[in-house]
């Protein structure tokens, strides 16, 4: 059975170099006896919701706005890899997830996040970037401190959701300064999830 219906938005483009418009598709539909429905764009706060705008928000750290447009929390489902385990010595054990090339890259920085483990969600603090203070990574990494969870997660594929952007990634003068900032970010995340659903 061939699908003979298509729905497109007024601003939709297709074909090589996005030259085709929805109205052209309607014309082609009439020619080949395919029902084409042109729908009005979906708006949020007077702005058109589009994949281009969502990607822009993710890249510029406007993650809360991106989430609102998506209708769910932006994130990744990636394997947990071994790191340098420095966080354990600071009482902030973390998981590391390598972000593959080709993915929409969130702005480097620290986020309130949530990690799903065995069907349960745990609040977390996630740094996305290259960890300039500790060890400069060659590829962007998501490093997450998971609150109220203790267990071995190496090799497991876990879903990470970004909820709120806290601050840009930066290089600290010392490990002590970095540790103090992580503690502060943890407090911010606790407050965030006291007011928002995980």
Predicted regions and their residues:
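Charged helix-capping and loop-helix junction motifs
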Residues: 18-26, 143
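Short histidine/acidic/glycine/proline-rich micro-motifs that form metal-
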Residues: 12-16, 43-45
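Phosphate/ribose-recognition catalytic cores of enzymes acting on nucleotide-derived substrates
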Residues: 83-198
């Amino acid at each position: 059975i061939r699908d003979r219906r298509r729905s497109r938005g007024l601003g939709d483009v297709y074909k090589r170099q996005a030259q085709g418009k929805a109205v052209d598709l309607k014309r082609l539909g009439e020619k080949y006896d395919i029902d084409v429905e042109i729908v009005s764009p979906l708006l949020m706060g007077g702005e058109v919701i589009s994949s281009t705008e969502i990607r822009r928000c993710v890249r510029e750290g406007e993650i809360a706005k991106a989430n609102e447009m998506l209708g769910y929390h932006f994130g990744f489902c990636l394997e947990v890899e071994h790191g340098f385990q420095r966080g354990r010595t600071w009482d902030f054990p973390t998981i590391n997830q390598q972000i593959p090339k080709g993915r929409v890259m969130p702005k480097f920085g620290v986020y309130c996040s949530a990690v799903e483990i065995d069907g349960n969600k745990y609040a977390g603090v996630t740094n996305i970037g290259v960890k300039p203070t500790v060890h400069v990574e060659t590829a962007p990494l998501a490093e997450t401190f998971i609150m109220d969870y203790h267990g071995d997660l190496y090799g497991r594929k876990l879903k990470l959701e970004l909820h709120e952007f806290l601050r840009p990634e930066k290089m600290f003068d010392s490990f002590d300064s970095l540790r103090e900032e992580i503690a502060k970010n943890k407090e911010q995340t606790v407050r965030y999830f006291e007011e928002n659903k995980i």
